[in-house]
Amino acid sequence: MVAIAVVTVSADETEELAGRLAGRLDPGDVVTVSGELGAGKTTFVRGACRALGVTGRVTSPTFTVGHRYRGSVDVSHLDLYRFRGLSSAEWGDLEPYFEGAVVFVEWPEAGGAALPPSRAAVRLEHVSPEARHVTIEAPDGTLLSGLVAE
């Protein structure tokens, strides 16, 4: 695994970073997004959605489990917060979200081995009320090369 780490000082900067990552993704790619409640997971996904041409409102799917957005490519946004692990029946309900879309999964820990391999894993941590420490890991350096200024 290769990782980069950066501190963003505003929601706009977090969205901008997400947008740069999103521009490197293709349908079928899965990005996991982890962090405490309020760490900025949905903010990160919103920035990615904007970069992928989504113009509508991007909200947390905590109570609906998933949203599918249309943009220049389809984007699926899942939130597994309410799950303790995915049963095969629950996975069957989620599987359509993975077809032909770039997929962002919040609280991926609940998905366990049921989730397909991720192209990138994002972790957000509070630094201050506005600032976030963002770590992005990928299997190799190709996806991350040049993502942030050295």
Which ranges hold each PLM region?
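N-terminal pre-Walker A segment at the start of P-loop NTPase domains
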Residues: M1-R20
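Short phosphate-coordinating micro-motif centered on Lys-Gly-acidic
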Residues: V2-A5, S87-A89, D93-E150
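Phosphate-binding P-loop
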Residues: A22-P27
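Short hydrophobic/aromatic beta-strand immediately N-terminal to the Walker A/P-loop
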Residues: V30-T32
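P-loop (Walker A) phosphate-binding loop of NTP-binding proteins
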Residues: S34-E36
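Conserved lysine of the Walker
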Residues: K41
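Conserved nucleotide-sensing/catalytic segment adjacent to the nucleotide-binding pocket
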Residues: R57, T62, R68-E109
